[in-house]
Amino acid sequence: MSTVREEQLNLEIPASDVGSRWQKLINWFQPKASQPLYDRMLFTLAMALLAFGFVMVTSASLPTADRLTGNPFHFAIRHGIYILISLAVMLATLRVPANSWNQQSGKLLLLGLIMLLMVLVVGYEVNGAQRWIKVGPITFQAAEVAKLFFCIYMASYLSRREDEVREATKGFIKPLALLFIAAVLLLMQPDFGTVVVLSATTVAMLFLAGARLWQFFAVFITCVLALILLIIVEPYRMQRLLTFLEPEKDPFGAGYQLMQSLIAFGQGHFSGAGLGNSIQKLQYLPEAHTDFIMAVVAEELGFLGVLAVIATVLMLVWRALIIGRRCLMQEQRYGGYLAYGIGIWFSIQAFVNIGVASGALPTKGLTLPLVSYGGNSLIISALAVGLLLRIDHERRMLGRKVAPRGGAE
């Protein structure tokens, strides 16, 4: 009986019966188990975060959506639509050769910088920050796009100028000059959180490319001095720092959001109050379904829920770094550095988001990749995951000496 079942499971439908197109479709979704054509673990982890994010955004946004729109599922429906668009973008990215992004990296970086400049000219303000551009019914956050485009450019630059980065100071300074331009445009919005993520990602990629150690000490000292200057020049940053250090001194003013987030973490205990049973999301905690969604996770699912999210994000980052390492071992420099860049970007942004929600870091206004509410963040994060899958797919196909799907290189 078991032999018959095995034969049925291994049965292949002949192309003559269903047509060549159907056979190609079957082959696409049924790769050989011994050598899958994509990183199944990476894909599964990304889908798990998207699904978990939908559940938590639905739970966290019900009171706010009901108060603002009269429909408690308003944000949940929008988030579901964003997820569908993100999946479509991810699948479309899988069909684009990685070398196409490499060839257009300079133009993409220029486009990203132009978008950051446009925000200052035609953008509109939300919650005290001018970060959004509106084109008809569509609004997008230029900073999210700039992060991805900068990673793509850095990967291209390092793949072409790796020796120059290692041996000459100018090879190290060139990308930092571009980073400085992007940072100035971001600080004018202001968006200090994206500056932190972009700077840390760029410096980490230069380190992995083999830049000299003394150069990093110089960058570190410069960044510390610049940070001190920014805190002194902008009063609101000083206020955020003081609030972060002693939020209980102004629990109903500047320290209100952090205090409510800490209360949520405290009420969650080990296993949480149960899904949907958060008290802090009932108009107490601002931005409960966006930047502070981890506070709701902590309250409803407890320490175990927070640990599960952190573990999933870390595994996704680990897969990205593994892809990068394997690409470099096969002399695929661009794909390797891009995978490294995306992995570092995700890890830093997740670290900052969780650190802010738990009171370990000052407020920055960054989303949790693939989890928090927000169409821009979701779509760009999904596109980045699609790039990782495509890079790994090409690496595997190169190992099998077969031309990659999705177009000629």
From Swiss-Prot:
The keyword Oxidoreductase does not apply. One of its GO terms (biological process) is regulation of cell shape. The keyword Secreted does not apply. It is found in: Cell inner membrane. Coiled coil: none annotated. Pathway: Cell wall biogenesis; peptidoglycan biosynthesis. Keywords: Cell cycle, Cell division, Cell inner membrane, Cell membrane, Cell shape, Cell wall biogenesis/degradation, Glycosyltransferase, Membrane, Peptidoglycan synthesis, Transferase, Transmembrane, Transmembrane helix. PANTHER family: CELL CYCLE PROTEIN (PTHR30474), PEPTIDOGLYCAN GLYCOSYLTRANSFERASE FTSW-RELATED (PTHR30474:SF2). Peptidoglycan polymerase that is essential for cell division. Belongs to the SEDS family. FtsW subfamily. This is Probable peptidoglycan glycosyltransferase FtsW. It comes from Idiomarina loihiensis (strain ATCC BAA-735 / DSM 15497 / L2-TR).
